[in-house]
């Protein structure tokens, strides 16, 4: 019965979830069909809206902190209405997960398509995708929003070949405001120099990222992808703008387009509106030229799913036979919680969206920067000394934290010193421990003994900080449950 429903067109188009739907449990409004993939921020599922029959994508994100900020950013998403931007329908709070209901793009991301086909895109294909992407950026920038996470993994295609921007602000803000996972390091490969340097940035930061994305689509990965992210942090602001590995393979128009995007000075960088008039984009062909590569990618995906399903069925049979021989009772092996197969990848590039692969370089860098009405006369450029300064990039926070931890650990193990009060101890700057040579053994031993109370004090401070963040979330969960019970 469900199969028949899926084959029929939607009874009416879903524009957004009404208040009645939002007060229900999400399982009453949607049938979850299968798991599409995972990102650093959570899992993505394909689902069907029961009332309209429309297919949607649902991101299930574990919420661990700053719930009010997340809700505020999601409400801003409702302002966006463009055919070149993935639509946001609404959100639910269930247990400790946030369910974000968004438009489903059946072909997946551009990076998914490159990975599945195991080949890069042609200039014609790139031009068509860039044209739609620029229209999406023009809309966002007109709305005075900065995406800050433009890359092939965040450009989705529907089955007709229409490109749409995804994860603008929602996933970016979620990953910025949630508790960070130690295994995740934001990659700076797509980021504009001014964003890395934190010297102030505006909408054209997205244009730099678009130029990097153009190279990514042409060559399969962004510049500097083969080096450590920490090294790239310093190379992007200091080195000349990156270019193609083999410039002779590409047309003058394409080369010039990328050059216009990758101008290090934000003031001299082209805008989305200007780039829509560039010869490379103006000569772009219709979306129909993307249908062949979409069909090819979807065929590969289907064959992999069928192959993996056969393997799962075979494993189930073998496990069942073993169980029957051991106990005389047939026991069917338990599958995953959704009863579906997750597709593995042959290539990884750090894409982080509605994906069918594991990320080796997941991105935490997307952040929507919203300007209030009071700031309109001042423009969108943000400086460090302003009240609403840009959030520190996640990768910088990560590396700074690791550096502090390394300094504390190495100092605590081998170089303690004699201070009467443990609170007076300062971490030596620039690894300068020469002064320890003048201390006596007794002084060094006193310093060592003082470390344990310091550690206990720091642990208690961390516990109190965690509790202060945890309690509002628990209160919000309880309030949400009471509200649902009232209906």
From Swiss-Prot:
Locations listed in the record: Cytoplasm; Nucleus
Annotated active site: 149 (proton acceptor)
Site (Cleavage): 326-327, 349-350
Swiss-Prot/TrEMBL cofactor(s): Mg(2+)
Catalyzed reactions: L-seryl-[protein] + ATP = O-phospho-L-seryl-[protein] + ADP + H(+); L-threonyl-[protein] + ATP = O-phospho-L-threonyl-[protein] + ADP + H(+)
Phosphotyrosine sites (modified residues): 433
Protein name: Serine/threonine-protein kinase 4
Origin species: Papio anubis
């Amino acid at each position: 019965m469900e199969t028949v429903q899926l084959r029929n067109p939607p009874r009416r188009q879903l524009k957004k979830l009404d208040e009645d739907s939002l007060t229900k449990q999400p399982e009453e409004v949607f049938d979850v069909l299968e798991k599409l993939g995972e990102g650093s921020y959570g899992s993505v599922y394909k689902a069907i809206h029961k009332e309209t029959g429309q297919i949607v994508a649902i991101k299930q994100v574990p919420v661990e902190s700053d719930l009010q900020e997340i809700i505020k950013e999601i409400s801003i998403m409702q302002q966006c209405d463009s055919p070149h931007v993935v639509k946001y329908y609404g959100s639910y709070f269930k247990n400790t997960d946030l369910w974000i209901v968004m438009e489903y793009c059946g072909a997946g991301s551009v990076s998914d398509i490159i990975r599945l086909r195991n080949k890069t895109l042609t200039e014609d294909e790139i031009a068509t995708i860039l044209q739609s992407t620029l229209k999406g950026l023009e809309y966002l920038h007109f709305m005075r929003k900065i995406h800050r996470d433009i890359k092939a993994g965040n450009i989705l295609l529907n089955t007709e070949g229409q490109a749409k921007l995804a994860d603008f602000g929602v996933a970016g803000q979620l990953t910025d405001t949630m508790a960070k996972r130690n295994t995740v390091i934001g990659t700076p490969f797509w980021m504009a120099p001014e964003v890395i340097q934190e010297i102030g940035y505006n909408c054209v930061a997205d244009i730099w990222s678009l130029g990097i994305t153009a190279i990514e689509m042409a060559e399969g990965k962004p510049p500097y992808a083969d080096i450590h992210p920490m090294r790239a942090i310093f190379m992007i602001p200091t080195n000349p703008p990156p270019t193609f590995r083999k410039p002779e393979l590409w047309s003058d128009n394409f080369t010039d387009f990328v050059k216009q995007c990758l101008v290090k000075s934000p003031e001299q960088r082209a805008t989305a509106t200007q780039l829509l008039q560039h010869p490379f984009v103006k000569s772009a062909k219709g979306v129909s030229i993307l249908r062949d590569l979409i069909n090819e990618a979807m065929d590969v995906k289907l064959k992999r799913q069928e192959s993996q399903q056969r393997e799962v069925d075979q494993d189930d049979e073998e496990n069942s036979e073993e169980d029957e021989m051991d106990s005389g009772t047939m026991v069917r092996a338990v599958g995953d919680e959704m009863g579906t197969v997750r597709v593995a990848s042959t290539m990884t590039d750090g894409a982080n969206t509605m994906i069918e692969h594991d990320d080796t370089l997941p991105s935490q860098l997307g952040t929507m920067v919203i300007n209030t009405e009071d700031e309109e006369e001042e423009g969108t450029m943000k400086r460090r000394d302003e009240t609403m300064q840009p959030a520190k990039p996640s990768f910088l926070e990560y590396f700074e934290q690791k550096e502090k931890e390394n300094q504390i650990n190495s100092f605590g193990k081998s170089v303690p010193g004699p201070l009467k009060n443990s609170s007076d101890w300062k971490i030596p700057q620039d690894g300068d421990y020469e002064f320890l040579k003048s201390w006596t053994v007794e002084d060094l031993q006193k310093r060592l003994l003082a470390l344990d109370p310091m550690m206990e004090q720091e642990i208690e401070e961390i516990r109190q900080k965690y509790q202060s963040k945890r309690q509002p979330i628990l209160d919000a969960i309880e309030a949400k449950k009471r509200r649902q019970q009232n209906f």
